[in-house]
Design a protein with these regions (language model features):
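Juxta-kinase regulatory segment immediately upstream of eukaryotic protein kinase catalytic domains
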Residues: 1-31
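ATP-dependent phospho-/nucleotidyl transfer catalytic cores
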Residues: 5, 31-35, 56-59, 65-69, ...
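Conserved ATP-binding subdomain of kinase catalytic cores across diverse folds
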Residues: 29-33, 37-47, 51-184, 257, ...
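A short, acidic/glycine-rich surface segment
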Residues: 106-112, 210-212, 328
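Catalytic activation segment of kinase domains across protein kinase-like and atypical kinase folds
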Residues: 218, 232-273
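Active-site activation/catalytic loop segments of kinase-like enzymes and analogous catalytic loops
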Residues: 258-302, 318-337
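Small/polar glycine-rich anion-binding or flexible loop at a beta-alpha turn
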Residues: 309-319
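Long, compositionally biased intrinsically disordered regions
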Residues: 360-363
């Protein structure tokens, strides 16, 4: 892999890759794009008989996704399904409003370079922008709409068609067991110094199986879910400022809607963020929760079962607890998973999530009322 941040059209490495995709015109340049930490991403600019066209070239990170081929099959199934649904709604060119794969000249979904790395090409959606944090209440509403719209579009797509590319992801009891294992075999001085955090986990242990028990009892269905519904994965239209689509689809796989809703609210309705410096400022913003839930249920309410809707508020607690114990377990094990910026970073992250969970618990009755009101507006 070359290290330069920008390549000319004559660069042999990218020229070879790009030339294998079925694209019109001539590539003028390709430069690194975005701030993503997972995949190498390049914006490719083409001249098609005087018309400028843009595409996104990405290398799939095989160290994160051990089966890139399965990731690509999932992405192809989901994007293909969404494109068909949008065309049925009368949208002539869905590539303008949703991610879609550009095939290779051999009609493949991706190609492999000489090192075995997987590469794929997407359309570039010029009419949309993403934001790293929630701008205002209207933006929070559109985040909810974007997530609900995505889930609605794939609600009739069988999750059996998708690979489980991240086994065990969002299965909270698994993360609780990893925490328990870390208490037995972790860094001793870190174990000794986190008595208060360990006690917090013990007091909330009953949260771990809440969602998995619903899955096991088949009270809620497995569906196609996004699994990474953070703020900057909901693209906003530049003109209308409405949700356009969800991007970054590598994590799509079978799951339950609560994984997405709970994580979306946890991340978007915490204005101080995961690295808040002052724990006393960490709290759930119920105004943002109401906006997210209102937008989400406007789009998703029609296909959700009553049991699914009823369980939405508690999912925010479960997912927040889950992330907190993941941070704490990683700290106890010596920071082997999450990237850190300073020695106690993961411990601080865990404390932020636990503080947020306390706020969610204190607001649970109101949160449940907000979801109920959004699900059944007057």
């Amino acid at each position: 892999m070359q290290k330069d941040s920008m390549f000319t059209a004559n660069d042999p490495f990218l020229t070879s890759l790009i030339s294998q995709f079925a694209l019109p015109g001539i590539c003028q340049k390709a430069e690194r794009f975005g701030r993503g930490l997972i995949n190498d991403t390049y914006l490719c600019e083409f001249d098609d008989r005087g018309n400028a066209r843009k595409y996104i070239l990405q290398r799939v990170n095989a160290s994160v996704f051990t089966r890139p081929d399965q990731v690509m099959e999932n992405v192809a199934i989901v994007t293909g399904h969404i494109v068909k649904k949008l065309r049925a709604e009368g949208i002539a060119d869905p590539s303008l409003v949703t991610p879609s794969l550009v095939p290779t000249k051999n009609s493949a979904l991706y190609l492999c370079d000489d090192t075995g790395a997987y590469w794929r090409m997407f359309n570039f959606i010029e009419s949309g922008t993403v934001f790293d944090t929630v701008v205002d209440v209207k933006h929070a509403y559109e985040i909810g709409c974007g997530l609900g719209r995505f889930q609605s579009l794939v609600s009739d797509l069988s999750s059996d068609l998708l690979h489980d590319t991240l086994p065990g992801f969002h299965l909270t009891p698994r993360y609780l067991k990893e925490f328990d294992d870390a208490l037995k075999a972790g860094v001793q001085n870190r174990i000794a110094g986190t008595v208060a955090e360990q006690a917090f986990v013990e007091r909330h242990r009953q949260l771990a199986p809440v969602l998995t028990d619903l899955i096991g009892s088949k009270k809620i269905p497995l569906r196609v879910v996004h699994n990474d519904p953070k703020v900057n994965n909901v693209m906003i239209h530049n003109g209308t400022h409405e949700a356009l689509c969800m991007i970054d689809l590598d994590t799509v796989k079978p799951g339950i809607v609560h994984f997405d809703f709970g994580d979306c609210v946890r991340s978007a309705a915490n204005p101080m963020g995961e690295d808040a410096t002052d724990l006393d400022t960490v709290k759930i913003d119920l105004t943002l929760v109401e906006a997210i839930a209102s937008g989400y249920l406007r789009e998703a309410g029609a296909f959700l079962t009553r049991t699914e809707t009823t369980a939405l508020p508690l999912s925010v607690q479960v997912i927040t607890f889950e992330l907190g114990i993941r941070f704490l377990a990683d700290y106890l094990k010596g920071d082997t998973y999450f990237r850190i910026d300073y020695p106690d970073h993961n411990l601080h992250r865990a404390r932020v999530q636990f503080k947020l969970l306390e706020s969610i618990e204190a607001s649970q009755e109101r949160l449940a009322s907000l979801v109920a009101q959004c699900a059944h507006p007057l």
